Amino acid sequence: MNKIVLLDASPLGMISNPSATPANLECYNWMESLLMSGYQIIVPEIADYEVRRELLRAGKTRGLARLDLLKNTLDYLPLTTAVMLKAAELWAQARNQGTPTADAKALDCDVILAAQALAENGIVATENVGHLSLFVEAKDWRDILPVS
């Protein structure tokens, strides 16, 4: 059982959101249960970028503070040259196979996240299984269950 979980932007955004909506609380409690079960939860730099840019745009200072807290509390995975080179390979592979995951001129965060997950031999917790599962093990975050 893979116990390394990389958070995609969607669950990371829910966990860092200070609004105690039922969905946000469910996601936060899910993360806590995985941690208590011995999972390593990783905040990938590319997911931090996706969440952070929107929080900055919207002036959500409480969300930024929570995101910073998560970044400093959980394991943070910075981007590296090796990861970016692998992401470029994945991007080209997807295009050549007719399965692009983003516009040709867009920064494709999914392939960058997939490259980070491959480097860590981890599973991606997401709400966007389709694109990510082309490259790496990805599951809806609700389907990654703690082990006893």
Locate each region found by the language model.
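Active-site neighborhoods of divalent-metal-dependent phosphate/nucleic-acid chemistry enzymes
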Residues: 75-123
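Glycine-rich, flexible loop segments associated with nucleotide phosphate handling
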Residues: 24-31, 67-70, 101-115
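Alpha-helix capping/helix-boundary segments
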Residues: 11, 47, 83, 113, ...
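Conserved beta-strand segments of alpha/beta enzyme cores
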Residues: 40, 73-75, 137
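Short catalytic/ligand-binding loop motif for oxyanion handling, primarily in non-cytosolic enzymes
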Residues: 14-15, 49-53, 132-135
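Acidic, PIN/NYN-like endoribonuclease modules and their adjacent C-terminal/linker elements
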Residues: 2-4, 33, 114-148
